Amino acid sequence: MTSNSDSTMHLSPPPPATSAVIRTRSPRTLCALGDEVQLHLTGADTDGQYSMFTVITAPGGGPPTHVHDNEDEWFHVIEGKVGFFSGGAWTEVGPGGSAYLPRGVAHTFKNLGDAPSRMLVHTAPAGFEDFFAELADVCAGAEAPDMEQVVAVSARHGIHYVQ
């Protein structure tokens, strides 16, 4: 910010934002509580603004009901039939449909079909990919993950499970 002698204030322009074009690359694939997560964009790609990943969920699968402290989520169903719980109600969404689940609101999703569902998910701000990476380490090689460890990892990333 600068000023001159006539008391007029002049604001300096904001620094230019960086942009990224990501050519086709193989996504990093992680397992998170039975879901396959394919990371496409991370905070490193977007200056921490958002993350983008694909979630593939087995029939009947989905996370426990939970609340995020840090990020909002947008889901776009590519394949399958998915039920979203938010605001105390379930809504069924098919291919081409989307759901917005803001931070601070208890929510979950469940694959309602008899084949794997596929969703493109955005989270903002970025960082949720770090949760998946740590959770994948906890779940690696385990038939059923240690839920105490899952809860601890989740809490470190601002995710809390509710009844």
Question: What feature does the model see in each segment?
Answer:
Residues 45-48, 57-61, 74, 81-82, ...:
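Short, charged/polar surface micro-motifs in flexible loops or helix N-caps
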Residues 46, 83, 103-129:
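Ligand-binding loop in jelly-roll beta-barrel domains
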Residues 36-42, 53-68:
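Conserved short histidine dyad/triad with adjacent acidic residue
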Residues 36, 59, 70, 89, ...:
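A generic "binding-loop/recognition-motif" signal
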Residues 1-50, 141-163:
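A short, N-terminal "cap"/entry segment at the start of jelly-roll beta-barrel domains
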Residues 23, 74, 81, 88-106:
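Short acidic-glycine-tyrosine-enriched beta hairpin
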Residues 114-150:
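A contiguous, mid-protein "functional segment" used to position or interact
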